[in-house]
């Protein structure tokens, strides 16, 4: 193995000099022995003259020029397979849950090529989530990619935790969760939530949280994806959850500046589209198995035209947009039914009844949005009888789109509800057709199926 020595350290970027005939390849892993600590670097650029520029996967505190560095002659490799289930690992696949070695039988490199075009498959099967607004307005496909878009504090992580709970409890596949640059507290909550729901033995957890250096946060999504690819290649249907894809982009921005690249729009890295593409093209289903991915996407300053969320949009099959305005009304999940879209919402895929109900709900809510201005200026009395009916039904629908979550029982005090797609369609169709015009609108708030709303109305 070739050895080199550190010649420059700038934050997370470390330059290492090797003999001219033994320069490491790009993406090779290097190891630095710094006292008792072991630090892994990943080669990013060859600068010439035997010098390579690398990114540190851990803290570069205590590094100094002249330290010996060993070329491991392979990319970063992580454990894969069933041994990783129920365990918490870092970007290098090392356990961080104090439960001893992973005991894996196989390790895979985190840099892999995407499946070829002829290996890929697409399915039209729907994945029922038990969340009314998602199943009705933006249904998920098995093997599809879903983005949860929202600003700070509108409920991306809670929605994701509910999806994992529902899918793990109702559909018994394996899941991989990659925590990319999020709060350590959320990682802890997530672990305990999975343990309490008895689904921890079906989930592999990989964390590179906010306190980690940018190199770590940039690669941890690939670590999680590699574990998911192994399950897929064994012929399983696996779920991959990434929270948060924006932090992956942000880590790339931090690294890009340190590597000396010119920034592009809004200060993002010039390689933004390519970095996103490398990750997203690997998240795909093949003829052997499928990866269904759910990705939380932070939207800076609630601006969906920001380059980072805008680049992510292009890769997704379904987009769930969380709205601050809906959250401020106390309606959770705060999904915007007019902004959220899905490729699956097609009569040939979901059936005519589902399609007509979803479009009918959207047109009623859209009409209500238009009438809001008139109501604000002139009041309800100036509306025609027909418009008054539209407003009454829309307000009931808006409240019926809310739902108590299992993972939020602690906050809401009401037990979580799983609503089947059949019940969801029946409920909204009933409201649209005027079957429940006699019920007060507060009966529809925070209930599961329509029967619960009818029961609640009796108590009001």
Swiss-Prot record:
GO molecular function, one term: ATP hydrolysis activity
EC numbers on record: 7.1.2.2
Reaction it catalyzes: ATP + H2O + 4 H(+)(in) = ADP + phosphate + 5 H(+)(out)
Stored Pfam families: ATP-synt_ab (PF00006), ATP-synt_ab_N (PF02874), ATP-synt_VA_C (PF22919)
Coiled coil: none
Principal place of residence: membrane
Enzyme type, top EC level: translocase
Binding site for ATP: 150-157
Membrane topology of this protein: Peripheral membrane protein
Annotated keywords: ATP synthesis, ATP-binding, Cell inner membrane, Cell membrane, CF(1), Hydrogen ion transport, Ion transport, Membrane, Nucleotide-binding, Translocase, Transport
PROSITE patterns, per the entry: ATPASE_ALPHA_BETA
Gene Ontology cellular component annotations, sorted alphabetically: plasma membrane; proton-transporting ATP synthase complex
PANTHER family, per the entry: ATP SYNTHASE (PTHR15184), ATP SYNTHASE SUBUNIT BETA, MITOCHONDRIAL (PTHR15184:SF71)
Function of the protein: Produces ATP from ADP in the presence of a proton gradient across the membrane. The catalytic sites are hosted primarily by the beta subunits.
Annotated family: Belongs to the ATPase alpha/beta chains family.
Protein's name according to its UniProt entry: ATP synthase subunit beta
């Amino acid at each position: 193995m070739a050895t080199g020595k550190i010649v420059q350290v700038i934050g997370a970027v470390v330059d290492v000099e090797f003999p001219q005939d033994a320069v490491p390849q790009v993406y090779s892993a290097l190891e630095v022995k710094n006292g008792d600590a072991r630090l892994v670097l990943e080669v990013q650029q060859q600068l010439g003259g035997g010098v390579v520029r690398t990114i540190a996967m851990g803290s570069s505190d205590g590094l100094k020029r002249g330290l010996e560095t060993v070329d491991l002659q392979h990319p970063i490799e992580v454990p894969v397979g069933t041994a990783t289930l129920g365990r918490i690992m870092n970007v290098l696949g090392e356990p961080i849950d104090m439960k001893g070695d992973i005991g894996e039988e196989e390790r895979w490199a985190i840099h892999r090529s995407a499946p070829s075009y002829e290996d890929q498959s697409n399915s039209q099967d729907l994945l029922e989530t038990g969340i009314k607004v998602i199943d009705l307005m933006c249904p998920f496909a098995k093997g599809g990619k879903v983005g949860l878009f929202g600003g700070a504090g509108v409920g991306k992580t809670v929605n994701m935790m509910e999806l994992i709970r529902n899918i793990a409890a109702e559909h018994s596949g394996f899941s991989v969760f990659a925590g990319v640059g999020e709060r350590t507290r959320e990682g802890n909550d997530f672990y305990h939530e999975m343990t309490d729901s008895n689904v921890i033995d079906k989930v592999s957890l990989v964390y590179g949280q906010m306190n980690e250096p940018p190199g770590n946060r940039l690669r941890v999504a690939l670590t999680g994806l590699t574990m998911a690819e192994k399950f897929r290649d064994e012929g399983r249907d696996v779920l991959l959850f990434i929270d948060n894809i924006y932090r992956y982009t942000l880590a790339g921005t931090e690294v890009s500046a340190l590597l000396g690249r010119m920034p592009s729009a809004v200060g993002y890295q010039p390689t933004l589209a390519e970095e996103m593409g490398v990750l997203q093209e690997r998240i795909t289903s093949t003829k052997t198995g499928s990866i269904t991915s759910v990705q939380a996407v932070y939207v800076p300053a609630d601006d969906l035209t920001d380059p980072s969320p805008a680049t992510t949009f292009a890769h997704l099959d379904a987009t769930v947009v969380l709205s601050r305005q809906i959250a401020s009304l106390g309606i959770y999940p705060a999904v915007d039914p007019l902004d959220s879209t899905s490729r699956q919402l097609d009569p040939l895929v979901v059936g005519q009844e589902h399609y007509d109900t979803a479009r009918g709900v959207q047109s009623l809510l859209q009409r209500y949005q238009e009438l809001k201005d008139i109501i604000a200026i002139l009041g309800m009395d100036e509306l025609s009888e027909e418009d008054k009916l539209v407003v009454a039904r829309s307000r009931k629908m808006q409240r019926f789109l809310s739902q108590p979550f299992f993972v939020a029982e602690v906050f809401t005090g009401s037990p979580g509800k799983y609503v089947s797609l059949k019940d969801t369609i029946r409920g909204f169709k009933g409201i649209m057709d005027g079957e429940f015009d006699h019920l007060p609108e507060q009966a529809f708030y925070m209930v599961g199926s329509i029967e619960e709303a009818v029961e609640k109305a009796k108590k009001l």
